[in-house]
């Protein structure tokens, strides 16, 4: 899913996961939500709990947070890479995997996770699918984007507040830094 910051990617992903659980009542529907920052993971966990109306849903595995169960996990990519996490789970353990800031997925730090797991659903969330190194993330999704709303459209549709940029000029001569 490609959507501008603030348009509700996490809420939409939680609603889709809720739909998935309802359609699969006889499965455990284990969720793995992966992000690169603790703040994103905490906010996402709270969003899922609100959408699912379950104050006990999911656990964090990041920083000082250690889960009692890994069934529905909000995991940092750093923790995944440092904990030999694949030894604790089979490739099909998670039914639904969400990777926030999916534009990072082409980086080596995400390759182990994406090549190991075989979820029934893989959902990538990003506002910026284009990468500076030219690597595409679309092959993970059969070269398709499931849903897309870019910043100009989100503003035009009044999903976001309009904004203004302000530039500040200064007199600092940065040319002297070239020789450092």
Per-segment meaning from a language model:
Residues 178-180:
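Conserved small/polar residues in nucleotide/adenosyl-binding loops
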Residues 63-93, 107, 111-112:
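Conserved helix/coil segment N-terminal to the catalytic DExD/H
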Residues 29-37:
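Conserved RecA-like ASCE P-loop NTPase motor core of nucleic-acid helicases/translocases
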Residues 104-163:
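Post-DEXD/H (motif II) to motif III coupling segment of the RecA-like Helicase ATP-binding lobe
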Residues 30, 70-72, 94-96, 119-123:
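Loop/turn-to-beta-strand initiation segments
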Residues 100-101:
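Walker B catalytic acidic pair
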Residues 39-60:
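Conserved helix-turn-beta segment of the N-terminal RecA-like "Helicase ATP-binding" lobe
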Residues 1-16:
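Walker A/P-loop
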